[in-house]
């Protein structure tokens, strides 16, 4: 089961979502998250911090985390 995290409300509840029994993966919808957070770019520090929080919640709860990235170098930035 994949939980798609793509808005500020989901970010606010990320630890509770990651703790749900049966969730296998947190998938970051970075562009939707960017819009929801009122940022102009997915590279905005607010969005970068949000993605880091999602990754940390995934690690803390033993969940995989996924996100589309344009290159493998970009993926290495997050994972």
Kindly give the residue locations of the regions a language model identified.
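Expand to "…catalyze enediolate/carbanion chemistry for C-C bond making/breaking, isomerization
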Residues: 1-79
